[in-house]
């Protein structure tokens, strides 16, 4: 074997390991949602002796963060259209049901969400123009 010893200062070039600041899994992945908590939930709810990889937790956390940002953006737009500054369950309902992909993904009933305004065309009065 060669005379090189594995290990050393690490990427930062610090002399002692005490000066390194520990980073969370979320910070390393560049996410806001907690990767460690998602991994813990995955391990707890995994069937039987199923093992959970760390990248699975990171990927799932990124998906959850993206979906949350998407719903909040659409709900914020709905609130802005109604000229209010607070997002309510009604705005969430309008945002989710207004987007086809989110509507098919989230089939849950939103409490205090109301219903979408819709009138069937058959119920509308027909205005016929008289031809001369």
From Swiss-Prot:
The cross-references to SUPFAM superfamilies, in alphabetical order and at most eight, read: Histone-fold
Pfam families (alphabetical): Histone, Histone_H2A_C
Residue numbers bearing the N-acetylserine modification: 2
Its cellular-component GO annotations read:
nucleosome; nucleus
> Which terms does the UniProt entry file under GO BP?
chromatin organization
Q: How is it modified after translation?
A: Acetylated by ESA1 and/or GCN5 to form H2A.ZK3Ac, H2A.ZK8Ac, H2A.ZK10Ac and H2A.ZK14Ac once deposited into chromatin. Acetylation is required for function at telomeres. H2A.ZK14Ac is acetylated at the promoters of active genes.
Which CDD domains does the record cross-reference, listed alphabetically? HFD_H2A
Question: What keywords is this UniProt entry annotated with?
Answer: Acetylation, Activator, Chromatin regulator, Chromosome, DNA-binding, Nucleosome core, Nucleus, Transcription, Transcription regulation
Q: Listed disulfide bonds for this chain?
A: none
* Entry's localization field: Nucleus; Chromosome
Q: Which domain of life is it from?
A: Eukaryota
Under Gene Ontology molecular function, one entry of this record is:
structural constituent of chromatin
SMART domains hit by this protein: H2A (SM00414)
Q: PROSITE patterns, per this entry?
A: HISTONE_H2A
Q: What is its main location?
A: nucleus
Stretch list, region Disordered? 1-30
- Cite the InterPro entries for this sequence: Histone-fold, Histone_H2A, Histone_H2A/H2B/H3, Histone_H2A_C, Histone_H2A_CS
Residues modified as N6-acetyllysine are 4, 9, 11, 15
Record note on quaternary structure: The nucleosome is a histone octamer containing two molecules each of H2A, H2B, H3 and H4 assembled in one H3-H4 heterotetramer and two H2A-H2B heterodimers. The octamer wraps approximately 147 bp of DNA. H2A or its variant H2A.Z forms a heterodimer with H2B. H2A.Z associates with the VPS72/SWC2 subunit of the SWR1 chromatin remodeling complex. Also interacts with RBP1/DNA-directed RNA polymerase II largest subunit.
Described function: Variant histone H2A which can replace H2A in some nucleosomes. Nucleosomes wrap and compact DNA into chromatin, limiting DNA accessibility to the cellular machineries which require DNA as a template. Histones thereby play a central role in transcription regulation, DNA repair, DNA replication and chromosomal stability. DNA accessibility is regulated via a complex set of post-translational modifications of histones, also called histone code, and nucleosome remodeling.
State the similarity comment: Belongs to the histone H2A family.
The protein, known as: Histone H2A.Z
């Amino acid at each position: 074997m060669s005379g090189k010893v594995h290990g050393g200062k690490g990427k930062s070039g610090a002399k002692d390991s005490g000066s390194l600041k520990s980073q969370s899994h979320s910070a390393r992945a560049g996410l806001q949602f907690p990767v460690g908590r998602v991994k813990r939930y995955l391990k707890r709810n995994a069937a039987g002796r199923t093992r959970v990889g760390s990248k699975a937790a990171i990927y799932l956390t990124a998906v959850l963060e993206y979906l949350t940002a998407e719903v909040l953006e659409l709900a914020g737009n709905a609130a802005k259209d109604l000229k209010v500054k607070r997002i309510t369950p009604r705005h969430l309902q309008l945002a989710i049901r207004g987007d086809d992909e989110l509507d098919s993904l989230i089939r849950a009933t939103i409490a205090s969400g109301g219903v979408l305004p819709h009138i069937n065309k058959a119920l509308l009065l027909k205005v016929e123009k008289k031809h001369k």
